[in-house]
Amino acid sequence: MPSIKSDIEIARAAAKKPIFEIGAQLGIPVEQLAPYGHDKAKVSAEFIAAQAGRKDGKLILVTAINPTPAGEGKTTTTVGLGDGLNRIGKKAIICIREASLGPCFGVKGGAAGGGYAQVVPMEDINLHFTGDFHAITSAHNLLAAMIDNHIYWGNEENIDIRRIAWRRVMDMNDRALRSMVSSLGGVANGFPRQGGFDITVASEVMAILCLATDLKDLERRLGDIIIGYRFDKTPVHARDLKADGAMAVLLKDAMQPNLVQTLENNPAFVHGGPFANIAHGCNSVTATKTALKLGDYVVTEAGFGADLGAEKFFDIKCRKAGLRPDAAVIVATVRALKMNGGVKKEDLGTEDVAALKKGCANLGRHVANVRRFGVPVVVAINHFVSDTDAEIAAVKEFVSRLGAEAILCQHWAKGSAGIEELAHKVVELAESGQAKFHPLYGDDLSLFEKIEIIASKIYHAGEVTADKAVRDQLQSWEEQGYGKLPVCMAKTQYSFSTDPNLRGAPEGHIVSVREVRLSAGAGFVVAITGEIMTMPGLPKSPSAERIFLNDQGYIEGLF
């Protein structure tokens, strides 16, 4: 029996086309592409602006059930479906997020898909790529430096150093940096204060880049960032420190979407990368809108399960950008359904139809939740070699009772040939006119009511708790004019609840909001629940331990 090739071996053997040829497939002239080597390029702002009058294609969201720690192949399915749509004669473009170094060297691995459904160059995409994350990190930390510098040189804005909300960021999992005291070492180093680091993908600058429509909108949003409060409790904005212009300069090139290709030489935009458990979890509005102008179908993903990524895609990205999705694909795996049914991770390779049927309650809730937004749904069963016929049949039967269809997909092993049936079904749904998209809640509700609606309708929580300080802060923001903003929930991805160990479809649990943060530039309020951290830590045995350069200088271990 031949050995199974690793993702990196498959990617390295890809017959890539020069990036200018991929651009030509979309009608992008050579002079409107800024190449980064031979296989990736940025699309110019000038070209993007010139497409404004063109009709939009169909927008397809790929989301998932609550995942196992290894992920369920949502990006793989997004890439596979894009290839599948092109295979059946549709002009399809894929839009996914860039990879963060944190999970790449931590536990989850890369973000370029897997098997024979990948975007390439895989190694570049998973590491430094075109430098967007570096630019975002630099812009964020420039503002942090200017805050402390302003205070050092006299504090003209009367910033209360006890109420500075702007932390620093880096693109790495490093729990040691969550809480720290800066400016130690004497008068020459400034005024000591407590602070800390978040991971870059949790940065408001990342969210702003992904929600901004052009450079002018980007600079306006950067200026709207609230870095902290004065002694009279009025907010201090980034523009008060004259930081917004320099930040926009650092982000000028990063605003341009990155064009790459799949293993089957189909176009893909890989741009932006906010996490879905601690941020809004979607690729950039610029990339999505550009793709909609250039393709008949755009396949995009939202991070983690539909309770996080899809809800934020609908309630934040679509609401803010005026997007109207035409269909949604929910990715499910037999192993994740069994885990939601109580099977331990080490036993997931053993057939257990009873546990799987129990775990299907998780899938059923995600189907119902997506339908709440008026979007038609199909379920993609991402096939693993350990799946049995009985288990697959049980999933299909369960989904059919919901009035939907579950389709077995083998794109990981077979590429576009393994996902044709799903591609045809997606076209059927998107062309049916069934989609009647609407957000979950209205703008005029109070911020706490919005949190309660998400918790009750999507998570099926029985109660939302928050101490007086949290409620008072929300009320204060409403009085300052921020009450119409949507809410971005920061929650574990492993459960509908705030307890990562509470699998399946729990009812009546309590959602405890322990902290709220105002992202005035991005245009949402973050509600942090449970034990979720905006700076993750590495696991006991991180992926980094297995990544190295071989004798030929090639990377090994990067999935």
UniProtKB/Swiss-Prot annotation:
Coiled-coil regions listed in the entry: none
EC number(s) per entry: 6.3.4.3
One Pfam family matching this protein: FTHFS
Transmembrane segments: none
Domain of life, per lineage: Bacteria
SUPFAM superfamilies hit by this protein: P-loop containing nucleoside triphosphate hydrolases
A molecular-function term among this protein's GO annotations: formate-tetrahydrofolate ligase activity
EC class name: ligase
Residues that coordinate or bind ATP: 68-75
UniProt-recorded name of the protein: Formate--tetrahydrofolate ligase
Organism: Rhizobium etli (strain CIAT 652)
Phylogenetic classification of the source organism: Bacteria, Pseudomonadati, Pseudomonadota, Alphaproteobacteria, Hyphomicrobiales
Gene coding for it: fhs
